[in-house]
Amino acid sequence: MVPPSAWLGLSGRRQARRRERRIVSTVNALGDLDRYRYMCLATFRRSGAEVATPVWFAASGGKLYVFTAGDSGKVKRLRHTARARVAPSDARGRVQGAWRGATARLVTESQMIERAHAALRAKYGWQVLLGDLFSRLTGRLRRRAWIEVEVEP
């Protein structure tokens, strides 16, 4: 079977450079979290119960950015408390590393949203563009909420 890189005409070295550009490493409190495609974002209910959700994320300026539906449970819980935890995970939410304490907040400034969106586009490429297209067609793009996560050292 021919690997997909051969279909695209990418040599092994070019493919590796392309992968390195997509995965922006941030040397600070994030550690190796940014090497993963998904992270588990745990937020807390008023009762103190933890609710963990796998999400796409991207690092920019030493912080992590996530987008979600504006009426999601994550958004409701973050309006109550900024306390959160993060851990690298797979798409199904199975944790792949250690949990880290974090502080999360909803982002409303358009400049910060643009920066977060650019970081996600750089990391996930065509997948974000395709998601944006479907969100725009269904009207969900305007109802999108952005979350900034600051991981504790």
Predicted feature residues:
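Ser/Thr/Pro/Gly-rich low-complexity, intrinsically disordered segments
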Residues: M1-A6
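Short, structured beta-strand-loop surface elements
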Residues: R17, D71-E152
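Residues at structural and domain junctions
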Residues: V27, D34, L64, A102-L106, ...
